Amino acid sequence: MRKSILSFLEKKGKNEKITMVSAYDYHSAKILDNCDIDIILVGDSLAMIVLGMQDTLSVTMDEMLIFTKAVSRGAKKSFVLADMPFMSYQGSDRDAILNASRFIKESHANGVKVEGGIEIASKIKLISQSGIPVVAHLGLTPQAVNILGGYRIQGKDLQSAQKIIDDAKAVQDSGACMLVLECVPIKLAQKISSILEIPTIGIGSGKYCDGQVLVYHDLLGLNKDFKAKFVKHFDKIDPQIGVEKYRDEVKSGIFPSEEHSFDYLGEELLDKLY
């Protein structure tokens, strides 16, 4: 049976960790599906990892649809989540809903992911009301890399931390069914996870999120040019064993440890957040 948004809400209620992996092809999707990974994210990171681009901004809808279709063929039980690429939803309402629907109709994805908070809340509401599950993404949002000034930790001070909390509440209220938190301080992610009713999925945001996500190539150590603080290599000899180790460490709370997390907020700042 295909995993569902309802099953992820139940996991949050039972304090059971959700496992997510970013992957881009049929073969890796089959491995992840066989390892009982909850969610396979077809991330726009494929622009850099698969297509050799400098960032995620140039990947197109048609390219994302092709890779999502391949993953959907390989995943029989895992929930397939597709990244909506840059400017596929930030423009008109019509573009947002038509592009989201293409992932469902043409590539057989089960939901879509968008980056941003209050500024895209209306788009989240529109897409979710059409019957398409929407996952939001806050913190380090790669599609906004030019505004953020590079790939760096977000929410390190009181003002920016409160902004992320406000955005998290806004996307939940607009109908987002889940929230990815990327590269925010561990205590901020913990606070957001406790405030929200929807599950949080962390990447570089500590162990208190309701689940974790890593890129398939990164957790297996296949990308020698990239080793972020939040990445752990599990096994590059046998992908099945590597994915199973990742899954088990996420579920048991072993991963991520403090060495894979960022901690910039002191208790005095946390007490001022609401």
From Swiss-Prot:
The reaction(s) this protein catalyses: 3-methyl-2-oxobutanoate + (6R)-5,10-methylene-5,6,7,8-tetrahydrofolate + H2O = 2-dehydropantoate + (6S)-5,6,7,8-tetrahydrofolate
Binding-site residues for Mg(2+), renumbered to this chain: D44, D83, E115
One Pfam family per UniProt: Pantoate_transf
Pathway entry: Cofactor biosynthesis; (R)-pantothenate biosynthesis; (R)-pantoate from 3-methyl-2-oxobutanoate: step 1/2
Transmembrane segments: none
Gene Ontology molecular function: any one: 3-methyl-2-oxobutanoate hydroxymethyltransferase activity
Localization of this protein: Cytoplasm
Disulfide bond annotation, renumbered to this chain: none
Organism domain of life: Bacteria
Residues engaged in binding 3-methyl-2-oxobutanoate: D44, S45, D83, K113
UniProt keyword terms in alphabetical order: Cytoplasm, Magnesium, Metal-binding, Pantothenate biosynthesis, Transferase
CC cofactor note: Binds 1 Mg(2+) ion per subunit.
SUPFAM superfamilies linked: Phosphoenolpyruvate/pyruvate domain
GO cellular component: cytoplasm
BP GO terms, sorted: pantothenate biosynthetic process
Catalytic residues identified in the record: E182 (proton acceptor)
Enzyme class, spelled out: transferase
Cofactor(s) listed in the protein's UniProt record: Mg(2+)
First-listed, main subcellular location of the protein, grouped into a coarse class: cytoplasm
EC numbers: 2.1.2.11
Subunit structure: Homodecamer; pentamer of dimers.
Main function: Catalyzes the reversible reaction in which hydroxymethyl group from 5,10-methylenetetrahydrofolate is transferred onto alpha-ketoisovalerate to form ketopantoate.
NCBIfam families: panB, PRK00311.1
The family this protein is said to belong to: Belongs to the PanB family.
Name this protein carries in UniProt: 3-methyl-2-oxobutanoate hydroxymethyltransferase
Organism: Campylobacter jejuni subsp. doylei (strain ATCC BAA-1458 / RM4099 / 269.97)
